[in-house]
Every structure is written in C-alpha cells, then in structure tokens.
Amino acid sequence: MDFTDLIDLASERLGGAVLVANDDFFAPKENLLKLSAPIFVEGKYTDRGKWMDGWESRRRRTPGFDWCIIRLGLPGIVRGVVVDTSYFRGNYPEHCSIDGASFSNLPTEQELTSDTVQWVPLLPEMPLAGDSQNPFPIHYEERVTDLRFKIFPDGGVARLRVYGEVVPDWDQLKRAGGYIDLAAAENGALVLSCSDMFFGHRHNLIMPGRALNMSDGWETKRRRGPGHDWAIIKLGRPGQIHRVEVDTSHFKGNFPESCLLEACNATGLPAETLTDLSTAWTTVLPRTKLQAHTRHFFDQELLDAGVASHLRFSIFPDGGVSRLRVYGTLAE
C-alpha cells in the first residue's frame, strides 16, 4: 500500500493544528493543514504582498531556517509526508526537514519551543521542487504526537500532508468503558480498499463526526452493469461487534438500495488477500434495505460473527454512505 493511501494524521478535520511558527509574514501558518487543495488568485494582494494559499515566511537576511510546530490530530506512526509547494515558484524553500516528538500530555507553546523537547529526526534535510508535490517516505516506528517542520532558508509551502497509521491510547479507551467504535479512524481503523470511490473517498466512511455534506461521504459512480460496490475495512483492534450504524445523511437521490456487512478474522494476513474469493466472510448484518438521508441503527438484527479483525461493507447496487460505525468490545 502506498503511504498516501493512509490517513492524514495532521489533517485539520481530525484536529491537526499548526501551533506556532517563527515567521508567517506573507501567509498564515494555518493554511498548511487546510483540507482543500491550494489555489492561486491572479492579481490578489494584501498589504504585505501577494496573497498565497499556504504558509510563507519573509525573506531571510541572516543564516538559519524557518520552522513551525504541528500537533497531529491523531497520534500515530508516520509512514510518509507530502510537501506541496503548489504555486510557489520563485519563493519556495530549497530544502526541508521534519522532526517528531511524543507527549503523554498537551504541552504549551512555550514548552514545545523550549530546549528541553527531545525532537527525533524523521526526515533529514531534503531538496524541494517548486510548484510540485514532494513525497518523502518516513522510516520511524514509534508513535508521534507533534512535528517540527523546518524550511531552509525561508519561503512558502502550500500544504503539508502527514500520512500514517493511527495509534490510539487503548488504555484510555478501556477506562472510558462501554462499546468502542472499532471502525473509527481515531481508533486506528483503515479502509484498505474499495470497488470504486469516484465521487467520495473511501476514508470518509470512518471519519469523526457527522458528514458536512454529500462530498464528505463515500460515493461510487453509477453502476451500468451487474454487481455491487464494496469497501474492506481493517478494524482498529480485533473485537466482537454488538451495534452498527449506517448513515446515509445527505444522500437522497443516490443512496444504496440496501447494504450487507460481513466480517472475518484475518489478523496477520496481507491486505491484498482479503479480496481473494477464498477469503471466508461471515455475515454480521444480512442484506438490509436502506432509506435516504437517514441514520440506520442495528443491534437485534446482527448475527454473531465471533472475533472480527476486518469487515466487508457491500452496497447494492451503488451509491453513497456518509458514515459507518461499528461498536463492539475488544477481543481478549
């Protein structure tokens, strides 16, 4: 799996934030994590210069570098980053680097910028190209909560995407009691693959909160032949399923006629084997009719599938679903 198929741990929709920057004279640091793709507006200026959709520092006249500190929305293991310099052509940094740190608490800005923080190099100083997507794999196997992003010597970056595997605090989740959403992104779940995601990304299924609109769900193209669409989800931890929610909010003329939820215990198996016909799936929710723009809750209808590590969520024949919630208990 390419690292860009993983969750963006720093996404602002997941709570990621640029806490502090040493300089954002031309364009604010908050732009760095915006969900939308960067844009360019010809002829748009502010009282400080050309308006740019990114983070941009002033021209450096002394030796050094510029930096910002980012709190990840979801702590985890970083597998790769994309440094997007779109529209920064004569004002992009020559190089960048990234350090990481892990905190059990929420340090203040003053604490994060002090010399006491033990920053670990995740990405050494690497050259950047202007007006480009600059992908870099990361090889560090520890959980990270915060990043320090350095640009050399100065300039502008449109977006920073930080892809990785979410590592939740399971002890804290257990102490909270009750059922855990095993299919939630914040609990380490991941949509490994799907048949189609023409109109809406598969990861939207497991994002926190309610969908903002139709684009914030998983939606497939119109099916013109036989068959149906599906998504395969790796649960955050194996567990037993007790309650399911299928939310079709915002999907009114394009919701699926019905859905089916199946499970298997494939811990340790390669993800690509889950699409093999030989994989034995057990029904959790039999094929059930759905309604438009509705939150559907199922508990009595569920069948006992034992301990599950992965799910196959099928929709018939096509359409869109905003969110899938799968509540259960962790396997011992």
Regions found by a protein language model. Name each.
Residues 72, 235-237:
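A short glycine/threonine-centered beta-strand motif
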Residues 1-67, 87-230, 239-240, 252-332:
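Trp- and acidic/polar-enriched beta-sheet ligand-binding modules for extracellular glycan
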Residues 79-80, 157:
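Short, well-ordered alpha-helical microsegments
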Residues 76:
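Active-site-proximal cofactor/substrate-binding loop regions of enzyme domains
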